[in-house]
């Protein structure tokens, strides 16, 4: 087994080999991060209410769901690089169309296309990185990928301080950044990976196997989608200025990076469901604090930073919880099914938040999130009473995963997680069986294969 020094050297070597992919992805995230805060600000100037913006954001997440399903078909036909170029070009065009056609129906349609393109890009890059990574470097590579994604998004939102939403300049800047993302990727010397076929894991079967993970994915995706898409709408309806809004929205994204690895490591050492219950309860309390803090108070930015630090890692922990219980041969199919559940929660969030803010005022943003997180904590407490957790030594290793619908559908590529042996190739899936009476106990087949 390689030591820590060899593992670090392998990670650095691999990062240098895929620097073009990370650069292209960073440019794309900065451009889309700017677009994400630009639309609510422009919508406020155009008289588009919180309810209408909620519809637009919900349609955007519907695009994520569709993109995660249709883009792999295009990948099989023409390959990763061509599909990436097509998606980035289409996404760049969509930003400019939003600047010209300022109506709720047109924004909904165009933002649906943007969601489809974003989901496709995530599928491409994550499968590419997983194909290049090894057992020893995968966690570090995906962690670096997550930092680039969150950092790019926060950087794009902060760019809003350079201009205003009432002109074309910021729309053009967003479009240019997304277009530039094509350059390093198309010139990359990295070999495009193949996309393997996946097994089936119906949502009903996954729910019967590990209901806590399915319900948790829906709830935490609701909260994460609200925090990423409706935070700017909360800022505009609360009377914040553009500068304050950019700080408020980017604070949650920055916070998302801070506790991903520490909370994941904690859930590896202790019963995962108990850790998730604690994180959900703390997040609920932070949402209540946010609801009680006046929007004019600068401390609300700090509250949102800590809130993001606890909320966003929940998605990855629920993914790990699902992997604790499903058979090794269904890891990839489970990932796709979790995307479906995640998309349902993500699409419901903007609609619900938009309606509650229009009906009860801006503070309903945090109150709604507090209710959702409180219900999640209560459900986890109930599940703890009816089903014993898996022993800590049999839990799968946590991997940093961003809470974004569409990003995980094919992210594990040809690799799956075995709870005892770690990451291994899908070619070896037939070598492991599951004792259906005890889903947490993985056994060797009786035919003597090894």
List each model region and its residues:
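Intrinsic disorder in cytosolic terminal tails and internal cytosolic loops
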Residues: 1-13, 193-201, 383-450
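Helix-loop boundary and gating motifs at the non-cytosolic
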Residues: 11-61, 212-216, 225-238
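Intracellular juxtamembrane helix-capping segments at the cytosolic ends
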Residues: 120-133, 312-326
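C-terminal membrane-cytosol helix-exit motif in multi-pass small-molecule transporters
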Residues: 160-161, 175-195, 376-384
